[in-house]
Design a protein with these regions (language model features):
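Residues that scaffold the ATP/ADP-binding catalytic core of kinase and kinase-like folds
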Residues: 11-12, 24, 46, 84-85, ...
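Active-site neighborhoods of divalent-metal-dependent phosphate/nucleic-acid chemistry enzymes
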Residues: 45-48, 71-116
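A generic structural signal for short hydrophobic patches within well-formed alpha-helices
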Residues: 9, 40-43, 82, 121
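Histidine- and aromatic-rich ligand-binding microenvironments
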Residues: 5, 36, 95-96, 117
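Acidic, PIN/NYN-like endoribonuclease modules and their adjacent C-terminal/linker elements
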Residues: 1, 103, 108-134
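Residues at the C-termini of beta-strands that transition into short coil/loop
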Residues: 37-38, 78, 117, 132
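Short loop->beta-strand "edge-of-pocket" segments that line small-molecule binding or catalytic clefts
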Residues: 2, 29-34, 68-75, 112
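Short, well-structured N-terminal submotif of metal-dependent ribonuclease cores
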Residues: 1-35, 49-63, 134
Length: 134
């Protein structure tokens, strides 16, 4: 089972997404694909930045985010995950907050993180898969 990183779901929104990513995701049963609530938060943060400059584009992205939330199994950030996150963040840079949250969610639910940025997750000791390379 797989936890999709933000860069993977964002890739699928592109007019011409990477073929290997599309092929991989089409080959996985929907029931095996998960999002962490953090991913939806990252997307919403980008929508709010976009809204300041282009309300129409932000509305389009908002509709896409709603579709994402309805289409995937979304895992909440609960107390156990936040405790794992705190362990992962001990003596780490503040720049990896979101990645550490996604990694903690993956650890708790025993999921493989699917990301283009495997290096960002390498020290979290979670299984990783880069669909852009296949």
């Amino acid at each position: 089972m797989y936890l999709l990183d933000t860069n993977v779901v964002s890739e699928l929104r592109k007019p011409r997404p990477h073929g290997a990513v599309v092929a991989w995701i089409e080959g996985i049963p929907d029931a095996d694909l998960y999002l962490c609530a953090v991913t939806l938060g990252e997307i919403q943060a980008d929508i709010e930045i976009t809204r300041e400059q282009n309300a129409l584009k932000a509305a389009e992205l908002e509709a896409w985010a709603e579709q994402l939330a309805a289409s995937y199994n979304v895992l909440p950030m609960d107390a156990a995950i936040f405790r794992l996150w705190a362990k992962l963040m001990h003596r780490q840079s503040d720049t990896i907050y979101e990645d550490a949250m996604i990694a903690a969610c993956a650890q708790k639910h025993k999921l493989t993180v699917v990301t283009r940025n495997v290096g960002d997750f390498a020290h979290f000791q979670v299984p990783l898969f880069n669909p852009f390379k296949n």
